[in-house]
Design a protein with these regions (language model features):
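Chromodomain-type histone methyl-lysine reader module
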Residues: 1-199
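Short, intrinsically disordered, charge-balanced linker/junction segments flanking boundaries
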Residues: 1, 208-211
């Protein structure tokens, strides 16, 4: 309702359309048929989580004028994970990823070593698309999910808002990096990795969704 009253509603709708398309392109979930949806909705043991669209104004910085300028509207569709019940919907622990001091000390030591070439990467959509653990989650898309309003999905991959999203994403990233030849994980667990490729030593430091 608030979007309909907003003077920039067309730009906001376009941002929502792009977010829905990203879910489709990444195959986050599959739509239920009318028969499947009726069966799920009538089953008292199944909880259908709601999703909502979160909007944010993105800005860019002009180094010449040293001012920020509006760039675009950004939409993000998130599952309302607060409706997940511990012990029923979640049978394992959840956590918020943080940085460890041991990782910081090791990273600073590597940065001071001239033999390393330093680069940083932001993993776009890091928490979106990770393979889920062995459980079934149903999500009802919001009214402003352009073209998919009210559709019920069975998630195939983790989505923003799920309490297990960070756990799933980090586990998948660690599994990928550890698949490299001669890779070792340091005492900091899934935050620090070291491997050799083409006789070159590589060190990877992870902080939330940045490398």
């Amino acid at each position: 309702k608030e979007v309909e009253k907003h003077p920039e509603k067309d730009e906001i709708r376009e941002a929502a359309r792009k977010e829905v398309q990203q879910w489709i392109d990444m195959q986050i979930g599959v739509s239920l048929s009318p028969e499947e949806r009726a069966k799920v909705e009538n089953d008292p043991s199944i909880v259908i989580l709601n999703a909502k669209m979160v909007y944010k104004r993105k800005y860019t910085f002009d180094p010449e004028t040293k001012q920020e300028y509006f760039l675009k509207w950004k939409a993000r569709m998130a599952v309302v994970g607060t409706s997940e019940v511990a012990g029923l919907d979640l049978v394992w622990s959840t956590f918020s990823p943080t940085v460890g001091f041991a990782a910081i000390r090791l990273m600073m030591a590597c940065l001071c070593n001239p033999k390393y070439t330093v680069g940083s990467y932001d993993m776009t959509g890091f928490f979106l698309g990770a393979e889920m653990h062995d459980r079934t989650v149903y999500v009802r898309l919001p009214r402003d999910a352009v073209g998919q309003e009210g559709v019920v999905l069975r998630l195939l991959r983790a989505a923003y808002g799920l309490r297990s999203a960070s756990r799933d994403a980090i586990a998948q990233l660690a599994k990928l990096i550890l698949s490299f030849e001669e890779t070792i994980a340091h005492e900091d667990g899934d935050r620090v990795f070291k491997f050799h490729k083409l006789a070159v030593e590589h060190c990877i430091f992870r902080y939330v969704d940045s490398l």
